[in-house]
Amino acid sequence: MKHKCFISYKKDDQYYRDKLVELFDSADVIDKSLNRFIESDDGEYIMSVIRRDYLKDSTVTLFLIGSHSSENEGNDWYGRPRNYFIQRELQASLYNGPRNTRNGILGIVLPNMYDEVYDGTNQCDVCGGTHRIVNINDDTVIREFSSNYYIKPHEGCAWSEDERYCTLVKWSDFLSKPEKYIDFAYDKRTAEISNMVKIRNLR
């Protein structure tokens, strides 16, 4: 694999993270996750520290979407988001700084979330076609992901792949062709849609 990956995941999903580490060559994955709060009100500083100390030279972030990886997990005893680390990892992944380019982001839907995320199809009243129902929202993912999967403003009755920055795949499909999906996420970094990436003011 030619693109170095950073894995953003909830500790509950350690099993799947370990499987990815086994799948990749050690040179292709950063075996480290954000594990401390960065005490600063300066968003630029926070993102630059995470890029420097954690994401380093990665170019694609793999976001494991499990049953506790959503925006709606609430806060901890200190009033901080329970998924603070994932939020910050995705923010830093999207950050296009002076010494780095943003990462491509590939959301990998874990098996216990298939039915929550993939909800069949519907017949469109606007175009008459059939669209897949994909539930990417605060109940399933972090807002940094959903806001860059369903990017607004948007015209039309559905989003094409060219109209999304974040990409999505089932765990089983990813395992069958990991390089294909990683390459696809990597290529988003220079695609026109990268100019529509949203990082700030999402909450």
Predicted regions and their residues:
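Conserved TIR/SEFIR loop-to-helix hotspot centered on a Trp-containing motif
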Residues: S69-N96
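Short loop/turn segments at strand-loop or loop-helix junctions that form parts
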Residues: K32, T61-S69, L110-P111
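Short, charge-rich binding segments
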Residues: D53-Y54, Y95-R99
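Short beta-alpha junction loops
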Residues: H68, G97-E116
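C-terminal interaction surface of TIR/SEFIR-family domains
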Residues: P111-R203
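Conserved N-terminal substructure of TIR/SEFIR domains
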Residues: M1-V60, K170-R203
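Short catalytic/ligand-binding loop motif for oxyanion handling, primarily in non-cytosolic enzymes
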Residues: Q14-R17, S70-E73, M113-D119
